[in-house]
Amino acid sequence: VINNALSQAFFSLSLGMGILITYGSYLDKKDNIVKAGSMVAIADTSVAFIAGLLILPAIFYFNPQVNTAELSDSSVSLIFVLLPNIFLTLQDTIGYFGAHAIATVFFLLVFFAAITSLVSIIEVPVAYLIDEKNISRRRALILLALTGGALVIMSALSFGVLTIFTEFTTYAGQSKSFFDVIIDVFYDTILPLNGLMVCLFVSFRWKHYQLTHELAMGNNTYAGSWLEKYMSFSLSSFIPTILLLIFCNTVAQKFFAYSLLGF
């Protein structure tokens, strides 16, 4: 549960993927990063909390026998199995057209959320190809579209369509599909590892005084504040320690079926 919660937090806030670093490079030196970061974190957490209060009670109300593992292990069954069943059940109370109208609006919102997330995610490799490889944005987008499209097709085929992708490999005593490998490696494992590496880089390579200087350029009250002291302490102490423990436990659980922390 802790591993999944951490991975979800990293993904929801776009942490550990280079997105914020890439977008941050486009900001003006005088922009208030402290205020902007606080607003994003508070808004994202609030929306996620409210969504949980709305969705989870509805799921258990319409389907009291639901397997809780389906809710915690993957969001795929939540979006494409459990919620559609709720929309079908709503036909008994608000009618066919009302239920389908709600379902249509919901999946449109999911579509736009996916598109906006894709834009931010794809900007990272696009910026790398443009800045480091001197490739035009058009060529970079075409290259990434072909690569990403191939991975998407392989992931889609791993849901029981082709055995080679459905039974892609085996580890931790279980057969894993290509989609499972993508989730286990890049979602559950790499995101916390990247967060750990950023903490170590800021604390021991870039140094805290440079971080303070950059943030203070857009916020005159940051230097010497309790937030500055907290960040300087946490980034070099308990945050990387927690991330390291969770990363090691995630690797042990996902790939060796063994829990280092006992949960």
What are these model-predicted stretches?
Residues F111-L118, L141-S155, F159, K176, ...:
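Hydrophobic alpha-helical segments of multi-pass membrane transport proteins
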